[in-house]
Amino acid sequence: MYYGFDIGGTKIALGVFDSGRQLQWEKRVPTPRDSYDAFLDAVCELVAEADQRFGCRGSVGIGIPGMPETEDGTLYAANVPAASGKPLRADLSARLDRDVRLDNDANCFALSEAWDDEFTQYPLVMGLILGTGVGGGLIFNGKPITGKSYITGEFGHMRLPVDALTMMGLDFPLRRCGCGQHGCIENYLSGRGFAWLYQHYYHQQLQAPEIIALYNQGDEQARAHVERYLDLLAVSLGNILTIVDPDLVVIGGGLSNFPAITTQLADRLPCHLLPVARVPRIERARHGDAGGMRGAAFLHLTD
Protein backbone atom coordinates (compact mmCIF):
# COMPACT_ATOMS: atom_id res chain seq x y z
CA MET A 1 0.00 0.00 0.00
CA TYR A 2 1.08 3.56 -0.67
CA TYR A 3 0.56 6.20 2.02
CA GLY A 4 0.44 9.80 0.85
CA PHE A 5 0.47 12.78 3.22
CA ASP A 6 -0.68 16.23 2.16
CA ILE A 7 0.58 18.53 4.91
CA GLY A 8 -0.40 22.17 5.19
CA GLY A 9 -0.60 24.86 7.81
CA THR A 10 -3.91 23.66 9.24
CA LYS A 11 -4.29 19.96 8.39
CA ILE A 12 -2.40 16.72 7.88
CA ALA A 13 -4.28 14.59 5.35
CA LEU A 14 -3.39 10.94 4.79
CA GLY A 15 -4.59 8.94 1.79
CA VAL A 16 -3.92 5.22 1.41
CA PHE A 17 -3.72 3.93 -2.18
CA ASP A 18 -3.54 0.37 -3.47
CA SER A 19 -1.34 -0.99 -6.25
CA GLY A 20 -3.98 0.10 -8.78
CA ARG A 21 -3.58 3.70 -7.55
CA GLN A 22 -7.09 3.71 -6.08
CA LEU A 23 -7.85 5.52 -2.82
CA GLN A 24 -8.81 3.03 -0.11
CA TRP A 25 -8.91 5.18 3.02
CA GLU A 26 -8.22 8.71 4.16
CA LYS A 27 -8.05 10.61 7.41
CA ARG A 28 -7.31 14.18 8.42
CA VAL A 29 -6.02 15.64 11.67
CA PRO A 30 -5.03 19.21 12.65
CA THR A 31 -1.42 20.21 12.03
CA PRO A 32 0.45 20.85 15.30
CA ARG A 33 1.93 24.32 14.93
CA ASP A 34 4.17 24.75 17.96
CA SER A 35 5.73 21.39 18.82
CA TYR A 36 7.95 19.38 16.47
CA ASP A 37 7.55 16.29 18.64
CA ALA A 38 3.77 16.63 18.44
CA PHE A 39 4.05 17.01 14.67
CA LEU A 40 6.14 13.84 14.35
CA ASP A 41 3.73 12.00 16.66
CA ALA A 42 0.74 13.02 14.53
CA VAL A 43 2.31 11.62 11.35
CA CYS A 44 3.58 8.45 13.02
CA GLU A 45 0.22 7.73 14.66
CA LEU A 46 -1.53 7.99 11.30
CA VAL A 47 1.00 5.61 9.76
CA ALA A 48 0.54 3.14 12.62
CA GLU A 49 -3.24 3.31 12.23
CA ALA A 50 -2.97 2.65 8.49
CA ASP A 51 -0.52 -0.23 9.03
CA GLN A 52 -2.93 -1.86 11.48
CA ARG A 53 -5.98 -1.27 9.29
CA PHE A 54 -4.41 -2.80 6.18
CA GLY A 55 -2.12 -5.34 7.83
CA CYS A 56 1.03 -4.16 6.10
CA ARG A 57 3.88 -1.66 6.27
CA GLY A 58 2.95 0.86 3.62
CA SER A 59 5.40 3.17 1.90
CA VAL A 60 5.30 6.79 3.06
CA GLY A 61 5.43 9.89 0.87
CA ILE A 62 4.87 13.46 2.01
CA GLY A 63 3.94 16.60 0.13
CA ILE A 64 4.52 19.86 1.94
CA PRO A 65 4.69 23.53 0.91
CA GLY A 66 8.20 24.92 0.73
CA MET A 67 11.65 23.48 0.12
CA PRO A 68 11.69 19.82 1.22
CA GLU A 69 15.42 19.65 1.87
CA THR A 70 17.90 22.49 2.07
CA GLU A 71 21.64 21.88 1.75
CA ASP A 72 21.93 20.81 5.39
CA GLY A 73 19.02 18.37 5.10
CA THR A 74 16.45 20.49 6.89
CA LEU A 75 12.99 21.48 5.73
CA TYR A 76 12.02 25.05 4.85
CA ALA A 77 8.24 25.45 5.15
CA ALA A 78 7.01 28.78 6.49
CA ASN A 79 3.40 27.53 6.64
CA VAL A 80 4.37 24.58 8.85
CA PRO A 81 6.40 26.27 11.62
CA ALA A 82 6.60 23.21 13.87
CA ALA A 83 8.65 21.34 11.26
CA SER A 84 10.44 24.17 9.45
CA GLY A 85 14.19 24.07 10.00
CA LYS A 86 14.04 20.43 11.12
CA PRO A 87 15.45 17.30 9.40
CA LEU A 88 11.93 16.01 8.81
CA ARG A 89 12.65 13.30 6.25
CA ALA A 90 15.52 11.83 8.25
CA ASP A 91 13.61 11.93 11.54
CA LEU A 92 10.49 10.29 10.12
CA SER A 93 12.52 7.65 8.29
CA ALA A 94 14.22 6.76 11.58
CA ARG A 95 11.03 6.68 13.64
CA LEU A 96 9.04 4.72 11.07
CA ASP A 97 11.95 2.46 10.08
CA ARG A 98 11.22 2.89 6.39
CA ASP A 99 12.19 5.15 3.50
CA VAL A 100 10.16 8.36 3.73
CA ARG A 101 10.07 10.49 0.59
CA LEU A 102 9.42 14.20 0.69
CA ASP A 103 8.61 16.71 -2.03
CA ASN A 104 6.87 20.04 -2.31
CA ASP A 105 3.13 20.16 -2.76
CA ALA A 106 3.25 21.56 -6.31
CA ASN A 107 5.40 18.65 -7.50
CA CYS A 108 2.97 16.26 -5.82
CA PHE A 109 0.08 17.90 -7.66
CA ALA A 110 1.87 17.42 -10.98
CA LEU A 111 2.84 13.84 -10.13
CA SER A 112 -0.74 12.98 -9.22
CA GLU A 113 -1.97 14.17 -12.60
CA ALA A 114 0.86 12.49 -14.52
CA TRP A 115 -0.20 9.15 -13.01
CA ASP A 116 -3.82 9.57 -14.10
CA ASP A 117 -4.80 6.52 -16.15
CA GLU A 118 -5.30 8.59 -19.30
CA PHE A 119 -2.21 10.75 -18.85
CA THR A 120 0.43 8.06 -18.26
CA GLN A 121 0.92 7.91 -22.05
CA TYR A 122 2.68 11.30 -21.95
CA PRO A 123 6.44 11.29 -21.16
CA LEU A 124 6.69 14.95 -20.10
CA VAL A 125 3.85 16.42 -18.06
CA MET A 126 3.77 19.97 -16.79
CA GLY A 127 1.49 20.87 -13.89
CA LEU A 128 0.48 24.53 -13.69
CA ILE A 129 -1.29 25.90 -10.62
CA LEU A 130 -3.31 29.11 -11.00
CA GLY A 131 -4.51 29.63 -7.46
CA THR A 132 -3.58 31.96 -4.62
CA GLY A 133 -0.19 31.98 -6.32
CA VAL A 134 1.25 30.51 -9.50
CA GLY A 135 3.41 27.40 -9.41
CA GLY A 136 3.67 23.91 -10.71
CA GLY A 137 5.93 20.99 -11.42
CA LEU A 138 7.50 18.90 -14.16
CA ILE A 139 7.18 15.13 -14.39
CA PHE A 140 9.36 13.12 -16.78
CA ASN A 141 8.59 9.42 -17.25
CA GLY A 142 6.64 9.38 -14.01
CA LYS A 143 9.32 11.07 -11.91
CA PRO A 144 9.38 14.66 -10.61
CA ILE A 145 12.18 16.92 -11.79
CA THR A 146 13.18 18.81 -8.66
CA GLY A 147 16.47 20.54 -9.40
CA LYS A 148 19.29 21.30 -6.99
CA SER A 149 17.27 23.76 -4.91
CA TYR A 150 13.81 22.20 -5.32
CA ILE A 151 12.62 25.26 -7.27
CA THR A 152 11.89 23.59 -10.61
CA GLY A 153 8.35 24.61 -11.50
CA GLU A 154 8.33 27.92 -9.65
CA PHE A 155 6.83 29.42 -12.78
CA GLY A 156 5.19 32.26 -10.88
CA HIS A 157 8.55 33.90 -10.28
CA MET A 158 9.39 34.30 -13.94
CA ARG A 159 9.25 37.97 -14.91
CA LEU A 160 6.73 39.39 -17.34
CA PRO A 161 8.01 38.86 -20.91
CA VAL A 162 8.70 41.93 -23.01
CA ASP A 163 5.76 41.08 -25.28
CA ALA A 164 3.49 41.36 -22.25
CA LEU A 165 4.63 44.93 -21.68
CA THR A 166 3.99 45.70 -25.34
CA MET A 167 0.54 44.19 -24.98
CA MET A 168 -0.34 45.90 -21.70
CA GLY A 169 1.50 49.16 -22.27
CA LEU A 170 5.04 50.15 -21.39
CA ASP A 171 3.74 52.00 -18.33
CA PHE A 172 2.17 48.79 -16.97
CA PRO A 173 3.05 48.52 -13.24
CA LEU A 174 5.77 46.05 -12.31
CA ARG A 175 4.31 44.94 -9.00
CA ARG A 176 6.59 44.01 -6.14
CA CYS A 177 6.43 40.30 -5.37
CA GLY A 178 6.70 38.59 -2.01
CA CYS A 179 10.01 37.11 -3.23
CA GLY A 180 11.46 40.64 -3.33
CA GLN A 181 11.57 41.01 -7.12
CA HIS A 182 9.32 43.09 -9.37
CA GLY A 183 7.15 41.93 -12.27
CA CYS A 184 6.78 38.24 -11.34
CA ILE A 185 3.93 36.76 -13.35
CA GLU A 186 2.33 35.37 -10.17
CA ASN A 187 1.14 38.87 -9.36
CA TYR A 188 -0.89 39.03 -12.58
CA LEU A 189 -1.90 35.44 -13.36
CA SER A 190 -2.90 34.09 -9.93
CA GLY A 191 -6.43 34.42 -8.63
CA ARG A 192 -5.34 37.55 -6.79
CA GLY A 193 -3.67 38.82 -9.96
CA PHE A 194 -6.81 38.17 -11.99
CA ALA A 195 -8.74 40.42 -9.58
CA TRP A 196 -5.94 43.03 -9.48
CA LEU A 197 -5.93 43.34 -13.28
CA TYR A 198 -9.65 44.02 -13.23
CA GLN A 199 -9.26 46.69 -10.56
CA HIS A 200 -6.29 48.25 -12.40
CA TYR A 201 -8.21 48.73 -15.64
CA TYR A 202 -11.76 49.31 -14.37
CA HIS A 203 -11.22 50.78 -10.89
CA GLN A 204 -13.64 48.31 -9.32
CA GLN A 205 -12.61 45.92 -6.56
CA LEU A 206 -14.14 42.52 -7.30
CA GLN A 207 -12.96 39.01 -6.48
CA ALA A 208 -12.27 36.47 -9.23
CA PRO A 209 -15.56 34.53 -8.76
CA GLU A 210 -17.54 37.77 -9.06
CA ILE A 211 -15.74 38.72 -12.28
CA ILE A 212 -16.28 35.26 -13.73
CA ALA A 213 -19.99 35.45 -12.86
CA LEU A 214 -20.22 38.73 -14.79
CA TYR A 215 -18.37 37.11 -17.69
CA ASN A 216 -20.88 34.26 -17.76
CA GLN A 217 -23.71 36.81 -17.81
CA GLY A 218 -22.23 38.41 -20.93
CA ASP A 219 -20.94 41.58 -19.25
CA GLU A 220 -18.78 43.34 -21.87
CA GLN A 221 -16.28 44.71 -19.35
CA ALA A 222 -15.74 41.30 -17.77
CA ARG A 223 -15.39 39.70 -21.20
CA ALA A 224 -12.77 42.26 -22.23
CA HIS A 225 -10.94 41.58 -18.98
CA VAL A 226 -10.91 37.81 -19.57
CA GLU A 227 -9.62 38.34 -23.12
CA ARG A 228 -6.77 40.45 -21.74
CA TYR A 229 -6.00 37.92 -19.01
CA LEU A 230 -5.93 35.00 -21.45
CA ASP A 231 -3.61 36.91 -23.78
CA LEU A 232 -1.28 37.64 -20.87
CA LEU A 233 -1.40 34.00 -19.76
CA ALA A 234 -0.65 32.83 -23.31
CA VAL A 235 2.37 35.08 -23.82
CA SER A 236 3.78 34.09 -20.41
CA LEU A 237 3.10 30.39 -20.91
CA GLY A 238 4.62 30.58 -24.39
CA ASN A 239 8.02 31.31 -22.88
CA ILE A 240 7.72 28.37 -20.51
CA LEU A 241 6.61 25.99 -23.26
CA THR A 242 9.51 27.04 -25.46
CA ILE A 243 11.91 25.95 -22.72
CA VAL A 244 10.08 22.86 -21.45
CA ASP A 245 8.19 21.58 -24.54
CA PRO A 246 5.83 19.28 -22.59
CA ASP A 247 3.45 16.73 -24.06
CA LEU A 248 0.69 17.72 -21.66
CA VAL A 249 -0.14 20.73 -19.48
CA VAL A 250 -2.53 20.10 -16.59
CA ILE A 251 -3.94 23.22 -14.94
CA GLY A 252 -5.03 23.24 -11.31
CA GLY A 253 -5.85 25.83 -8.66
CA GLY A 254 -8.99 27.89 -8.25
CA LEU A 255 -8.89 29.47 -11.71
CA SER A 256 -8.87 26.02 -13.32
CA ASN A 257 -12.58 25.89 -12.48
CA PHE A 258 -13.12 28.63 -15.09
CA PRO A 259 -13.63 26.68 -18.35
CA ALA A 260 -12.30 29.47 -20.59
CA ILE A 261 -8.81 28.87 -19.19
CA THR A 262 -8.53 25.37 -20.64
CA THR A 263 -10.82 25.73 -23.66
CA GLN A 264 -9.48 28.98 -25.10
CA LEU A 265 -5.81 28.96 -24.15
CA ALA A 266 -4.50 26.56 -26.82
CA ASP A 267 -5.71 28.73 -29.72
CA ARG A 268 -3.76 31.71 -28.36
CA LEU A 269 -0.42 29.94 -28.01
CA PRO A 270 0.90 29.40 -31.57
CA CYS A 271 1.81 33.05 -32.13
CA HIS A 272 4.01 32.91 -29.00
CA LEU A 273 5.84 29.69 -29.97
CA LEU A 274 8.45 28.76 -32.54
CA PRO A 275 6.91 27.97 -35.94
CA VAL A 276 7.90 24.31 -35.62
CA ALA A 277 6.48 23.95 -32.09
CA ARG A 278 3.37 21.90 -31.46
CA VAL A 279 0.88 23.11 -28.88
CA PRO A 280 0.64 20.55 -26.07
CA ARG A 281 -2.60 19.05 -24.88
CA ILE A 282 -4.10 21.28 -22.18
CA GLU A 283 -6.41 19.81 -19.56
CA ARG A 284 -7.98 20.77 -16.26
CA ALA A 285 -6.69 18.84 -13.25
CA ARG A 286 -8.76 15.75 -12.53
CA HIS A 287 -8.04 14.86 -8.94
CA GLY A 288 -8.96 17.99 -7.00
CA ASP A 289 -8.33 17.98 -3.27
CA ALA A 290 -7.02 14.41 -3.39
CA GLY A 291 -4.17 15.42 -5.70
CA GLY A 292 -1.72 16.26 -2.93
CA MET A 293 -2.19 12.91 -1.20
CA ARG A 294 -2.08 11.02 -4.50
CA GLY A 295 1.13 12.67 -5.64
CA ALA A 296 2.83 12.15 -2.29
CA ALA A 297 1.87 8.47 -2.28
CA PHE A 298 3.11 8.05 -5.83
CA LEU A 299 6.59 9.31 -4.94
CA HIS A 300 7.21 5.59 -4.36
CA LEU A 301 6.00 4.65 -7.84
CA THR A 302 9.06 6.31 -9.33
CA ASP A 303 11.59 3.55 -8.53
From Swiss-Prot:
Entry-linked CDD domains: ASKHA_NBD_ROK_NAGK (cd24057)
Pathway: Cell wall biogenesis; peptidoglycan recycling
Alphabetic keyword roster: ATP-binding, Carbohydrate metabolism, Kinase, Metal-binding, Nucleotide-binding, Transferase, Zinc
Keyword Amino-acid biosynthesis part of the UniProt annotation: no
Positions annotated to bind Zn(2+): 157, 177, 179, 184
GO BP terms in the entry: N-acetylglucosamine metabolic process; peptidoglycan turnover
Catalytic activity: N-acetyl-D-glucosamine + ATP = N-acetyl-D-glucosamine 6-phosphate + ADP + H(+)
Binding site for ATP: 4-11, 133-140
InterPro entries listed in its UniProt record: ATPase_NBD, N-acetyl-D-glucosamine_kinase, ROK, ROK_cs
Pfam families in UniProt: ROK (PF00480)
Transmembrane segments: none
Annotated GO MF terms: ATP binding; N-acetylglucosamine kinase activity; zinc ion binding
EC number: 2.7.1.59
Entry's family note: Belongs to the ROK (NagC/XylR) family. NagK subfamily.
Annotated function: Catalyzes the phosphorylation of N-acetyl-D-glucosamine (GlcNAc) derived from cell-wall degradation, yielding GlcNAc-6-P.
Record-given protein name: N-acetyl-D-glucosamine kinase
Organism of derivation: Shigella boydii serotype 4 (strain Sb227)
